[in-house]
Curated annotation (Swiss-Prot):
<dbReference type="GO" id="GO:0045892">
    <property type="term" value="P:negative regulation of DNA-templated transcription"/>
</dbReference>
<dbReference type="InterPro" id="IPR023120">
    <property type="entry name" value="WHTH_transcript_rep_HrcA_IDD"/>
</dbReference>
<protein>
    <recommendedName>
        <fullName>Heat-inducible transcription repressor HrcA</fullName>
    </recommendedName>
</protein>
<keyword id="KW-0346">Stress response</keyword>
<keyword id="KW-0678">Repressor</keyword>
<dbReference type="InterPro" id="IPR002571">
    <property type="entry name" value="HrcA"/>
</dbReference>
<dbReference type="GO" id="GO:0003677">
    <property type="term" value="F:DNA binding"/>
</dbReference>
<dbReference type="Pfam" id="PF01628">
    <property type="entry name" value="HrcA"/>
</dbReference>
<dbReference type="InterPro" id="IPR036390">
    <property type="entry name" value="WH_DNA-bd_sf"/>
</dbReference>
<keyword id="KW-0804">Transcription</keyword>
<dbReference type="InterPro" id="IPR029016">
    <property type="entry name" value="GAF-like_dom_sf"/>
</dbReference>
<dbReference type="InterPro" id="IPR036388">
    <property type="entry name" value="WH-like_DNA-bd_sf"/>
</dbReference>
<comment type="similarity">
    <text>Belongs to the HrcA family.</text>
</comment>
<keyword id="KW-0805">Transcription regulation</keyword>
<dbReference type="InterPro" id="IPR021153">
    <property type="entry name" value="HrcA_C"/>
</dbReference>
<comment type="function">
    <text>Negative regulator of class I heat shock genes (grpE-dnaK-dnaJ and groELS operons). Prevents heat-shock induction of these operons.</text>
</comment>
Amino acid sequence: MKPLSARQQQVLQATVHHYVDTMEPVGSRTLVQRFGIPASSATVRSAMGALEKRGLLTQPHTSAGRIPSALGYRCYVDDLLPEPGVAVQHLERELTGLSLRWAALDDLLQQLARRLTDFTGLMSLITRPQQPRAQLEAIRLVQSGDRLLVMLVEDSGRASHLNLRLPPGASDELTAIERWTDQQLEDGSINWRSLPPQLQRSGDVLRSALDHPSMSPETPLVVHGLSRLVAEPEFHSTAELRPLLELIDDQPCAVVSATDQPGVWIGEEHPQKALQACSVVQAPYRCGQEGVGQVALVGPMRMAYATAHAAVQRVARHLDLLLN
């Protein structure tokens, strides 16, 4: 694409700022008056026409002014993003007051997500660092009446347990199913396809225990500010909102991209169709050698990108410092 002239850059930046603030299309006269562009309305109108021809601005109604297109937002983010305001310094001061106790990492992530949402007005997500999966070392089953205590022991030393009701007839199989799982784990993992038919009832109980959420080592991510996202005018349509809520409810980790670089996904750039009416701003953070987590903000394409970009970068950097 041919580079924009200085005047076109100024007009595009002003149009984005106006629309983010007001959600109203804007005309040339308003841009001149509000943003002090040193040119006549006719000159600014000509620049807006050129930007529209290049697909950077669009006119929602024949008699209306212009608003940014997804391509216009992309050009703005890549080339015209201003320095964040002094308000970001206030966020940094808040972050310095948050410290990490290893027993309360989830609490820390919740606090950071809440501060991100309060600061930006956007929905925030923070994923935990993707850590290597622990190897299951042993399964122990303890019966007490019609209850069964299932205990899992990992090679890391971590243990978890679940107390559940034992179905009729399954108690006779417990010794055999425990012996079978020991043999399976000696080979590295459990191959359920090799489960003997006579152990099917106890096997079903054990599989349901292994799949129970309480047996997961940790929450994979925290989400805050969903109500802020739902309240945005862009999502008042049920057709836009339903697939977005379903994605966040069923596959929240799919909202962020697995990357070790900061990024901004605008509209149809996002691989998830449910998010193609949104923008996602994210930055990675690291936890030693254990993996990469993501700090992300989700909102309409009409968002304050400079503030969002600066906020996720600072929270990610704060987590880097705390975890390393």
